[in-house]
């Protein structure tokens, strides 16, 4: 794999599983298609009718919950922060965890439904040490469905 000096720019699910601690049903990133360390990430999740959440949200009109869109954005931001510091390093990932600190300027614009490819477009707004602030949009077919600014910290995993 790549080093932190020359990080890879794409991650498939087998790579994501080695960096993020999330698992089904809370892993909300299927693939990273673009990653520029300390700058930006583009990732996505394919939304299918088989998502457990559609059993109750809503049975006759399935809509992917906005809070899960924001969580997917946060997971993408966590990947960006971690790989900006350590590149693709599964051993280091076992010792670190990214915690949400704040969520600001959230807007939901268009419902996300089964069959949509939900893209997360995030950029680093600022970071100092282990504190990272990212902002951006979630998009479907090039249309903004949500936007937010997120702050997180990278901590030691106990």
From Swiss-Prot:
Keywords: Cytoplasm, Lipid A biosynthesis, Lipid biosynthesis, Lipid metabolism, Lyase. The active site is at 57. Involved in unsaturated fatty acids biosynthesis. Catalyzes the dehydration of short chain beta-hydroxyacyl-ACPs and long chain saturated and unsaturated beta-hydroxyacyl-ACPs. Its EC number is 4.2.1.59. It comes from Helicobacter acinonychis (strain Sheeba). The gene is fabZ. Gene3D superfamilies: Hotdog Thioesterase (3.10.129.10). GO terms for cellular component: cytoplasm; membrane. It catalyses: a (3R)-hydroxyacyl-[ACP] = a (2E)-enoyl-[ACP] + H2O. This is 3-hydroxyacyl-[acyl-carrier-protein] dehydratase FabZ. It is found in: Cytoplasm.
């Amino acid at each position: 794999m790549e080093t932190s000096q020359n990080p890879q720019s794409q991650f498939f699910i087998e790579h994501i599983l080695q960096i993020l601690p999330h698992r089904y049903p809370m892993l909300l990133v299927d693939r990273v298609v673009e990653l520029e360390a300390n700058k930006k990430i583009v990732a996505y999740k394919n939304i299918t009718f088989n998502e457990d959440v559609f059993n109750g949200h809503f049975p006759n009109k399935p809509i992917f919950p906005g809070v899960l869109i924001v969580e997917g954005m946060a997971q993408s931001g966590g990947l960006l922060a971690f790989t900006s510091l350590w590149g693709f390093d599964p051993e280091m990932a076992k010792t670190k965890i990214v915690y949400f600190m704040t969520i600001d300027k959230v807007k939901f614009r268009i419902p996300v439904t089964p069959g949509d490819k939900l893209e997360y477009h995030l950029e680093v707004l600022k970071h100092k040490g282990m504190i990272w602030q990212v902002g951006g949009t979630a998009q479907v077919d090039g249309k903004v469905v949500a936007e937010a600014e997120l702050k997180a910290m990278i901590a030691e995993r106990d």
